[in-house]
From Swiss-Prot:
Transmembrane segments: none annotated. InterPro entries: ATP_synth_asu-like_sf, Lumazine-bd, Lumazine-bd_dom, Riboflavin_synthase-like_b-brl. GO terms for biological process: riboflavin biosynthetic process. This is Riboflavin synthase. Disulfide bonds: none annotated. It comes from Saccharomyces cerevisiae (strain ATCC 204508 / S288c). 2,4-dihydroxypteridine 1 binds at G4, I5, V6, S152, L153, T154, S170, M171, I172, K173, H174, T175. Gene3D superfamilies: 2.40.30.20. The keyword Lipid biosynthesis does not apply. It catalyses: 2 6,7-dimethyl-8-(1-D-ribityl)lumazine + H(+) = 5-amino-6-(D-ribitylamino)uracil + riboflavin. Homotrimer.
Amino acid sequence: MFTGIVECMGTVLENNPYDDSESGGQGVSITIGNAGSILTDCHVGDSIAVNGVCLTVTEFNNDSFKVGISPETIKRSNVASWIQGTQVNLERAVSQDVRFGGHYVQGHVDTVANIVSRRPEGNSIIFGFQLRDQEYFKYIVEKGFICIDGTSLTIIKVDPLSQGGAFYISMIKHTQDNVIMPLKKIGDEVNIEVDLTGKIIEKQILLTLENQISKKDSTLNTMISNIIEEKVRNYLNK
């Protein structure tokens, strides 16, 4: 579990498509450097969020660490575009002594979005985004949380009528100085994790409705039957 408060920015040292070393596991691995500040208490097997993707440390030293990448992660995120020199946001998994300053972030990226606009507003930057996979747009609400490249941000506007749907965030100067997004340009991809709360609420509503519909004497079925009967009576009495 993470908070979306980026601890430091690291740099991709290597993206190995087939790492047959013991720590590579005969799969894709990525090595990230300039990460010494978050490795002082690191252990093999620890979780680190890299641009919002929860990844497992398989090897590390004083300044860099290696992680394994699954096919599912490649499909969901923009990890395939990380090449030598790419800067990435880094955050360790939360511990008992960490203040919870952002929001509940799993590190399970849902999809990617493209930056479609960026403009200054005072000392802030307003970024606009469009999702690759539109089924996640229903979880994006004004003043709700969203995790973009591992950064906890607040949605300031949702525009469902624009082509493909768009949403916007405002990034203050302090955040600009400590995350990678200001380095990106229009058209670049970012990783998106929507707020888990919306998914949980949707799931509970669906389960409740399914349960109600499956029972003939349920409150919902009784209500629907009464409405239908009333409509039929009104129609016949015309």
